[in-house]
């Protein structure tokens, strides 16, 4: 597989940004390019939670899933890609279990905001065909905006995309919401990461809920304390490669069941096709 491969079933990417090692660890971009890529893969393969038994291709398909036959877009960065889980994330587990087709537009280290290259906004406009038919559009609330201290911005009184400052978190989210509503006309779902030590990301989560009131999108809130409280410290250490990125086991046994339950509800309530 190349660093960035995209087709109807899967797409993935890695960042080419120049970052310090500390930033790389947080952003999930370590090993994304050059010789570091092989080192990253070897390091991830040694993690118990990434053992072959947890691979997505060993996941059994469910019968009569509400998501079966759906077409779902996933937009995100390293957590959506699966940077610490050998390129497999909740996307592959959900698709394998539920029998839907998908596009995964995920590039490690990228931000929602256009303040940095290869942003969510830019890739949504340039890489996702506006004529494609999607039943759901799922977008990650990126931790990279928090790590890079992208300005939060303010909620606009306007619904016109030209009025949104996409160099801010708020403007980027509003732009995505407006764009999805115009071109794909399907339910939009944002998902957060599980709780870690970041006041800035906590502010982004709060902002996301405020924007929900304006735009009416759905939120799968993994940041909620109850999600972290649902696993023991021992399980957490097994499920998470670092405070941001799950292992294969973390996606399969922790994140996927939560996301699946919420996507079932959303599909049953809002998907007409």
Write out the residue ranges for each language-model feature.
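Catalytic His-Asp segment of secreted/periplasmic serine-dependent ester chemistry enzymes
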Residues: 193-273
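Soluble or luminal CAZymes and related metallo-dependent hydrolases
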Residues: 86, 115-120, 165-172, 200-204, ...
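Conserved SGNH/GDSL esterase-like catalytic core that processes O-acyl groups on lipids
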Residues: 71-73, 79-160
């Amino acid at each position: 597989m190349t660093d960035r491969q995209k087709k109807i079933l899967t797409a993935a990417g890695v960042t080419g940004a120049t970052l310090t090692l500390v930033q790389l660890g947080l952003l999930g971009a370590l090993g994304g390019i050059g010789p570091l890529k092989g080192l990253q893969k070897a390091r991830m393969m040694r993690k118990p939670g990434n053992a072959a038994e947890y691979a997505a291709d060993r996941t059994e398909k469910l019968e009569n899933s509400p998501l079966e036959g759906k077409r779902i877009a996933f937009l995100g960065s390293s957590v959506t890609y699966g940077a610490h889980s050998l390129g497999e994330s909740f996307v592959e587990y959900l698709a394998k279990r539920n029998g839907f087709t998908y596009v995964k537009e995920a590039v490690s280290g990228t931000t929602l905001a256009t303040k940095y290259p290869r942003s969510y906004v830019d890739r949504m406009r340039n890489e996702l065909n506006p004529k494609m038919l999607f039943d759901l559009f799922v977008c990650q609330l990126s931790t990279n905006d928090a790590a890079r201290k992208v300005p939060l911005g303010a909620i606009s009184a306007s619904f016109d995309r030209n009025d949104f400052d996409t160099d801010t978190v708020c403007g980027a989210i509003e732009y995505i919401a407006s764009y999805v509503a115009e071109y794909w006309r399907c339910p939009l779902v944002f998902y957060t990461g599980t709780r870690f030590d970041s006041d800035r990301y906590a502010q982004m989560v709060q902002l996301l809920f405020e924007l929900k009131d304006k735009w009416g999108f759905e939120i799968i809130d993994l940041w909620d304390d109850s999600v972290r409280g649902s696993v023991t410290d021992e399980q957490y250490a097994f499920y998470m490669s670092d405070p941001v990125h799950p292992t294969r086991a973390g996606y399969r046994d922790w994140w996927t069941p939560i996301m699946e339950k919420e996507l079932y509800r959303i599909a049953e309530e809002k998907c007409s096709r």
